[in-house]
Amino acid sequence: VQIKKRTGRLHPITKFEKETVALFEKLGFQRFDAPHIDSDYNNFEALNIPSNHPARDLWDTLYIDSQKYGIEPGKLLLRTHTSNSQIRIMKKFKPPTRLMIIDRCFRYENLDARHEHTFEKFEIVYIDKNLSMGNLQYLSEYFLKNIFGEEIKVRLKPKYYPFVEPGAGVDGECIFCKGKTEKQIGRKLRV
């Protein structure tokens, strides 16, 4: 009796992550990692999100019982975004800088079909002279067209974010219904 050899497959998130990293490596970006457990300072304060800033109301933070480790309560947490890498990058590297962060983030969420306490986030830190919103638009289109196909329609639009200025949102038209459905869910992809 011959036993059929088992073969494994990459998890879809892992596969997507590898594709994304390869795309941005072609443009000269390098991967950068930051810790999952971090200080309140790196996660909020260093990003101009002080304790009373309205941006902190946009997510619920998972704080760690830091007194066990001799750290002031409320000062140690599971990062809520990959942006905790930004202060480290700016301290460690001189411009021009092309780095990407793709990793897990954690938020205290009411779990449902669209919300989970752990999720993956991708972000780039691109610091150089003469960069503009045009560069952001190009990188957004480059990413979406390479992942979802050249036919995807992409739109960059100004958007208010309390922690960054200027801010922009990127919409990608649904590749299945081509934006024809009346339902909001599944019609657009937010980047």
Give the residues covered by each predicted segment.
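TRNA-recognition modules of translation machinery and tRNA-sensing kinases, especially anticodon-binding
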Residues: 2-191
